[in-house]
From Swiss-Prot:
Organism: Xylella fastidiosa (strain M12)
Gene Ontology CC entries for this record: cytosol
Similarity remark: Belongs to the UPF0301 (AlgH) family.
Highest taxon above the source species: Bacteria
Protein's UniProt name: UPF0301 protein Xfasm12_1428
Length: 188
């Protein structure tokens, strides 16, 4: 009899201070896909060097919204750093989108960016360049090795919390003060 598989989709991974990988140190990542082939997520608290206005310009999409043009594009992870990923919260689905949970979607479709530029897109959206990927069993091993804490995703944390506060606030949701933890782990 096989064990049921636990999905990590719609969970936030919070890097513990002992995280050995510099791509994820003090990082918060939303898991968007998780199955027997591996996992995919987007880092939510690393700003890239680009604004959304610069990305839209490169794509030939114009917008009159100064707020949209000034929005920081996230550095979503080391995999496909030249590819755009949009995480949005909406009742409407734009282009091919992956349901993460409870009205939260991930897409690489240009349609959602064009709709946002026109003012008809989702009002709550994050844009990232790149993503994070884990081979089959790799993320589970990292969890066992105490590299990550895990909490359910929360739209307020994703869309209403400043980038520099997401790491500590995510951990605070389960009562953990990351600044009180050491940067090494041990096993009994």
């Amino acid at each position: 009899m096989s064990m049921p598989t636990m999905t990590l989709v719609n969970q936030l991974l919070i890097a513990l201070p002992s995280m050995p990988d510099p791509h994820f140190a003090r990082g918060v990542a939303l898991i968007c896909q998780h199955d027997s082939n591996g996992s995919m997520g987007v880092v939510l608290n690393r700003p890239s060097e680009y604004t959304l206005g610069e990305v839209l310009f490169q794509m030939g999409i114009e917008t009159a919204s100064e707020t949209l043009r000034e929005q920081v594009v996230l550095a979503g992870g080391p995999v496909h750093p030249d590819r755009g990923f949009v995480i949005y919260h909406s009742e409407h689905v734009w282009g091919p989108s992956l349901l993460i949970g409870d009205g939260l979607y991930l897409t690489t479709s240009r349609d959602v960016l064009a709709a946002m530029a026109e003012g008809s897109g989702p009002s709550r959206a994050l844009v990232a360049l790149g993503c994070a990927g884990w081979a089959a069993g790799q993320l589970e091993l990292e969890l066992v090795e105490n590299n990550w804490l895990m909490v359910p995703a929360d739209a307020s944390l994703l869309f209403d919390t400043a980038l520099e506060q997401r790491w500590q606030r995510a951990a605070g949701r389960i009562g953990v003060d990351l600044f009180r933890l050491t940067d090494y782990t041990g096993h009994a």
